[in-house]
A protein has these predicted regions:
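A membrane-periplasm/extracellular boundary helix in multi-pass inner-membrane enzymes
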Residues: 181, 189-190, 255, 272-312, ...
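Aromatic-anchored transmembrane helix interface
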Residues: 86-96, 113-124, 135-157, 176
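Alpha-helical transmembrane segments of multi-pass inner-membrane proteins
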Residues: 10, 17-25, 43-48, 99, ...
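Membrane-interfacial loop-to-transmembrane alpha-helix junctions, especially the N-terminal start
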Residues: 51-63, 108-121, 167-172, 240-241, ...
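N-terminal signal-anchor transmembrane segment
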Residues: 9-101, 127-131, 415-417
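Loop-to-helix entry and N-terminal half of a specific, functionally important transmembrane alpha helix
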Residues: 244-246, 366, 385, 392-422, ...
Length: 463
């Protein structure tokens, strides 16, 4: 193939330079002079170069930094044709594209068995997009769900054995350094100045609850790193990680997120009962010690008051949740029970069916109620099938790594616990970390159940 003449190359370069020169002022104007927005384009170019160089390296870098991404991504959003687009959406697109290309390059590693319930849930969600009262919001929500599946599938290409699972664990642990440091800064600047009674730590995340759920995941993986014989830590790293755990627990308390407290306590209780019962006494003392903290005590005592139904201001958060769940479920008509009202419908119709909404589009704060309302009984059945299949697969990991299997199943249980009281499906960064860990654990489990396929690659891989 003959290369183009020098004149053509020169002319093409001049046209590209002219186009870039004309576009830059328009780009700067669209970014409203914001330094962060102006840096979005160079950052996008770096992502594109990494995408061409090594897609798995790009995915690892995204996961390493995504926990601190909400601060930046929120400031890069711009309105184009009435649709809000930001750098975060472009990163999501890269993640989905990475998964597509990984599967296309090596389809034999695609986890068919666990992908079936995922596909059922995504199909139910896609039907929900078609029925959605707000198409733009529904498409964004669906792309978020699709990115969770993309991260989960990518783990099967990232992890080829127990060694890679350890790398995945370390990656998530390292991702917590920036949020932890930022949280300490936030505490020093705002918490101590205004008092801790009404202070809720959110760090780099958009809401304290998301930070709390992320911390429970990091604490779980810290436990694995400290106790697993598969991870060899130097004395210095072991000391640092051991000191890091109490810091994370302190940050978790400062989020004031009760469901995360319950999930974290349940995880450590299960670990103590199954692995090290000598710590049971310390575990029983932990709630009593936590109640000595004024903010924790107030959050717990708050559940005993404000249960009368008058208005949102006079309801505690749990009583308010019970009310919105009841009104939402009672509003579902029998003909809408199979397929629901469409993706994003609960939030859209909340001011209609919930008399205490005050005109605010509240989320369900319970993904089981949300899925039943939006995707119907079929969507909820697909969701239940997905988690049942995951539980079945993760049990097999115990043959390879008993503690690793416990950590993965505990993460599954944690996810189900917090899903009963929050809008977990909307928390993108947290979900990415959950699904990369679950995908990595499933990859380890499946790698041990297909020895014949490993010996004879022509017969396929993880199915």
């Amino acid at each position: 193939m003959q290369s183009p003449p020098p004149a053509v190359l020169t002319g093409g370069a001049l046209l590209v330079a002219l186009a870039v020169g004309l576009a830059l002022p328009l780009y700067a104007q669209a970014m409203s002079g914001s330094a962060v927005r102006l840096l979005a384009l160079p950052a996008l170019l770096v992502l594109a170069i990494l995408f061409l160089y090594d897609r798995l390296v790009l995915l690892a870098l995204v996961l390493l930094l995504r926990a601190a991404g909400d601060l930046v991504f929120e400031t890069t959003r711009v309105e184009i044709g009435g649709l809000a687009i930001g750098f975060g959406g472009l990163v999501n697109a890269f993640v989905i594209l990475i998964a597509v290309l990984l599967v296309a390059a090596r389809p034999e590693r695609f986890p068919t068995r666990v992908a079936a319930p995922w596909a059922a849930f995504l199909i139910a969600a896609l039907i929900g997009v078609g029925m959605a009262p707000n198409l733009g919001d529904a498409v964004r929500s669906y792309l978020g769900l699709l990115s969770y599946f993309a991260v989960f599938v990518s783990a099967f290409y990232f992890v080829r054995g127990e060694g890679d699972f350890k790398v995945c664990v370390k990656l998530v642990l390292l991702s917590s350094l920036l949020p932890a440091a930022y949280g300490l800064g936030e505490l020093a600047l705002h918490g101590l100045a205004g008092g801790l009674q009404a202070f809720r730590l959110k760090s780099t995340f958009s809401h304290p609850n998301i930070f709390a759920f992320y911390l429970t995941l990091v604490l779980l993986l810290s436990l694995y790193a400290l106790k697993s014989p598969a991870i060899a830590l130097t004395p210095l790293r072991r000391t640092l990680l051991t000191a890091y755990v109490p810091l994370l627990l302190g940050l978790l308390l400062l989020t004031q997120t009760r469901s995360a407290w319950v999930a974290c306590f349940a995880i450590f209780a299960l670990y103590t009962l199954l692995f090290e019962r000598r710590y049971l006494v310390y575990l029983l003392l932990a709630p009593a010690l936590a109640l000595l903290v004024p903010g924790v005590r107030e959050r717990v005592l708050d559940l005993g008051s404000g249960n009368e139904v008058v208005q949102y201001a006079k309801l505690n958060s749990f009583a308010w949740r019970l009310q919105i769940w009841e009104y939402g479920l009672r509003w579902i008509r029998p003909e809408n029970l199979p397929l629901g009202y469409g993706l994003g419908a609960f939030k859209h119709f909340a001011p209609v069916f919930f008399p205490y909404s005050g005109g605010v589009n509240f989320g369900a704060h319970n993904i089981y109620v949300q899925i039943l309302f939006e995707l119907g009984a079929l969507g909820l059945a697909a969701f239940a099938w997905l988690f049942a299949r995951l539980f079945s697969m993760l049990r097999r990991m115990a043959v390879v790594d008993r503690l690793g299997a416990f950590v993965a199943i505990a993460l599954l249980i944690e996810y189900l616990i917090i899903s009963a009281s929050d809008n977990v499906l909307a928390y993108l960064a947290f979900n990415w970390y959950v699904w990369i860990v679950l995908g990595a654990a499933c990859a380890v489990a499946l790698s041990r159940t297909a020895p014949v396929a490993a010996a004879r690659p022509t017969q396929g891989g993880t199915t």
